[in-house]
Amino acid sequence: MNFADEDYELKEVQRLEGHTDRVWGLAWKPAAGVDGVPSVLASCSGDKTVRIWEQSASTGSFQCKAVLEDTHNRTVRSCAWSPSGKLLATASFDATTAIWENVGGDFDCVSTLEGHENEVKSVSWNASGSLLATCGRDKSVWIWEVLPHNEFECVSVLQGHTQDVKMVQWHPSMDILFSCSYDNTIKVWSEDGDNDDWHCVQTLGESNSGHTSTVWALSFNASGDKMVSCSDDLTIKVWGTDIKRMQSGDGNVTWTHLSTLSGYHDRTIFSVHWSRDGIISSGAADDAIRLFVENEDGSVDQPSYKLLLKKEKAHDMDINSVQWSSMENRRLASASDDGTVKIWELGSSLGQKKQSM
């Protein structure tokens, strides 16, 4: 995607209010927003609830359609839709992960996954919806197999991190799992084809140009050959791999550091997300959102990235999550300690400039 040297602006189109505590996580429902299906966003909060927001076809504004409550008794830290959009997984500080089934707009808790010793921090579905991963403060990563009738079986408990695991994320097209932690590392997990055992195949840490403090989040580009991560060390790092070799089943393919973006946030960067058309968004404890794109004149092997836009005071407090819409390329949602969710649209500010001249 070519981003010419013109001015862009991130316009706030709606502020979603209703949560009574900080909002931790966001998840856009897949396959919504096309063929007349409305865009749907889930948000989860320290108020122990999940809210489902749906865009009105007539007004274009988002309205709260459901509040998922009375299941978790502590903070809901993370939420994720299954690829089909039929199930929503929610991870909570109460040490459980709940599975909600969406039937005609109504949500029923159909399964509760137990096993973590304490707070569950993150939940992620693989591309086919056959596996679910969770992680927590107990330093472990759990992989669950999705069985018929909304049953879930733990197939592996991965004990590689030495501290709290902040996030798990499946690769967008392959059954390879990534986790990031308070131990300053990202770990890559893969299944051994011979004996079905999951094991760590690579650790990205300080020794291979990785982060020097807590890694809070990571995200993949659309083709799955690059990954972006963010950290308490105030940097954003881009990693790359040989995706064709990986897809061919070569188990020796590794991820390498490509670029470090620093000096753009002055407090902890809590969230990064890569849009389908190549824009990296970041949200941080400095209440700001930043957008980055790849430099057109960078080399294939050593790409560099430039700041596309900065939005100061995007929220009144820390920004915990930024998520691009899966269907609307230029729509971004953000969640904050200020208890709100905001919907943003990215556009050129050229039109506004001409009108004001």
Identify the role of each PLM range.
Residues 1-40, 46-51, 56-58, 297, ...:
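Intrinsically disordered, low-complexity acidic/Ser/Thr/Pro-rich linker and tail segments
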Residues 2-3, 54-60, 101-105, 145-150, ...:
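Short loop/turn segments immediately following beta-strands, especially the blade-tip
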Residues 11-13, 61-66, 108-111, 152-156, ...:
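A structural motif specific to WD40 beta-propellers
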Residues 16-23, 68-76, 113-120, 158-165, ...:
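WD40/WD-repeat beta-propeller blade N-cap
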Residues 27-38, 79-85, 124-129, 169-175, ...:
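Loop/turn segments within WD40 beta-propeller blades
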Residues 44-48, 90-94, 128, 134-138, ...:
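Conserved strand-to-loop turn within each blade of WD40 beta-propeller repeats
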Residues 50-54, 97-102, 123, 141-145, ...:
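WD40-repeat beta-propellers
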Residues 323-355:
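Blade-level signature of beta-propeller repeat domains, shared across WD40, Kelch, NHL, RCC1
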